[in-house]
Amino acid sequence: RDRETGCELKILPGMYQLVNGEVNVSKLRPVNIDDLLGREEISVNMEEILNYVSGKTILVTGGGGSIGSELCRQIASHTPGKLIIFDIYENNAYDIQQELNMKYPELNLIVLIGSVRDYNRIEKIFAAHKPDIIYHAAAHKHVPLMESSPNEAIKNNVLGTYNLVLAADRWKVKKSVSYTHLTLPT
């Protein structure tokens, strides 16, 4: 069911089968998650995962982006000790900061502007806040754009991740999760 419209979504048999009379429109069926994934659904206990952040200092890189901001929303709803949003884009960081401050006024929220490319900046953040868990979502993700700027993709996605790994090791961070998606270049 669509959350905004309340409409029930159904899947139609293939056009070839419809045209050849092999099936008819009465064979409409509700859409399953398997239809969208193209594989079986993996069962994950989200409550257990999110409860893990309770009381901990959490750093979310790329916290203002599409993936990072959703991570911040989910984490904020499970009472972290401190949530640190780290993003290079102040507008995105500001927007999620305002949203979370309105929804969770008691949240210990720190918003920092900077780049994962800057190891010294990362070191200062780790020294000041000593994160328990890092969710790394700072990345260039639009493959066609990065194909024409591969040096920028490498500096941000590879070296930025490397900087975080070095700092996490140095500061003995307990857990680190990297969020990315893989796409085959054209």
Predicted regions span which residues?
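Glycine-rich phosphate-binding loop and adjoining beta1-alpha1-beta2 segment
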Residues: D87-Y104
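NAD(P)-cofactor binding segment of oxidoreductase domains
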Residues: D2-L12, K82-Y89, A128, I133, ...
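Rossmann-fold cofactor-recognition segment
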Residues: Y104-R117
